[in-house]
């Protein structure tokens, strides 16, 4: 089994990411082997598929444009005030729902900013947003089993094992690392679902069609490094260094933050937000002729449809994991 040229099936690498092949109706195709395959390489079997979610919900606290980099590779605090101009600031947080437009882009509701934005007559080289590290996905996904004899439907969770060719998110919470246990009060004291192939530990349900359990599933980004076991046991990697993104517009980085939105998180429990920074590929030049500043959200690959195998070797959908949304800043 492979998930990319020369890569082991369960290897955590860039070659193991990306979308899966779908049919004309958008259903993920299950190959004769009983597994989905890569959208570009039919010989590359996958245990997850990066797809475009139907709905993506996030709480935003701050947004700004900067004349120098707000991201730091070290230090206990972030500084996005000295060299940045805020275009959005809401201490309580504003819940934004992003709706897939069918091409990887999204519309935001409500609008992030009401009214005019006052920016300096400057050249901005960086941008940032501060958001909750609780990312929510509401998504349904169909599967095409016509090319395999291994099974006729996907297994999922709920009150008991569910089966069908359509699977959807339900109101449960998981972490990026699929940790076990219960969070502390900073994260709502919620029970975490590990996605181990049992009904109780799944954040999804399957059937012939979506039912009344269809809801937002929550994914907590608790660390940017490796973690295992129970919540709070593993140490936290609070920084994700700059790397390219599918939406373009520059390289992106992130830092986990405490509730004051300035101190770098040191534990899973005190890490409740994250700063998303962009090193702009083309600096934004704001002058007297600038009439428009826009923020675009990209959802391509922002839901990770994750699978495992049950003891009887049935393919089981464990969760629709939320990956950080892509953000593009433009001015004209």
Each language-model region and where it sits:
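A short, solvent-exposed, low-complexity linear motif enriched for acidic/polar residues
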Residues: 2-8, 13-332
């Amino acid at each position: 089994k492979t998930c990319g040229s020369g890569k082991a099936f369960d290897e955590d690498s860039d070659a193991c990411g990306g979308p899966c092949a779908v049919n004309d109706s958008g259903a993920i195709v299950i190959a004769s082997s009983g597994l989905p395959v890569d959208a570009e390489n039919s010989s590359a079997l996958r245990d997850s598929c990066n797809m475009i979610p139907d709905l993506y919900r996030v709480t935003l606290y701050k947004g700004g444009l900067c004349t120098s980099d707000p991201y730091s590779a070290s230090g206990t605090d972030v500084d996005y005030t000295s060299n940045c101009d805020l275009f959005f600031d809401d201490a309580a947080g504003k819940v934004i729902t992003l709706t897939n437009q069918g091409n990887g882009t999204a519309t935001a509701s409500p609008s992030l900013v009401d009214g005019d934005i006052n920016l300096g007559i400057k050249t901005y080289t960086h941008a940032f947003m501060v958001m909750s590290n609780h990312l929510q996905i509401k998504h349904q996904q169909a599967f095409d089993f016509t090319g395999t004899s291994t099974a006729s439907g996907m297994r999922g969770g709920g009150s008991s094992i569910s089966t069908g060719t359509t699977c959807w998110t339900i109101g449960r919470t998981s972490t990026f690392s699929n940790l076990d246990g219960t969070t502390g009060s900073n994260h709502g004291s919620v029970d975490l679902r590990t996605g181990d192939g049992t009904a109780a530990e799944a954040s999804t349900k399957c059937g012939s069609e979506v039912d009344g359990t269809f809801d937002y599933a929550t994914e907590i980004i608790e660390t940017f490094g490796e973690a295992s076991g129970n919540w709070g046991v593993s140490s936290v990697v609070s920084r994700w260094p700059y790397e390219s993104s599918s939406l373009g517009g520059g390289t992106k980085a992130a830092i986990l933050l405490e509730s004051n939105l300035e101190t770098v998180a040191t534990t899973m429990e005190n890490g409740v937000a994250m700063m998303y920074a962009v090193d702009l590929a083309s600096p934004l030049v704001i002058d007297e002729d600038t009439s428009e500043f826009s923020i675009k959200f990209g959802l391509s690959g922002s839901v990770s449809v994750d699978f495992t195998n049950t003891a009887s070797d049935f393919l089981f959908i464990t969760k629709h994991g939320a990956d950080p949304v892509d953000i593009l800043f433009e001015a004209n």
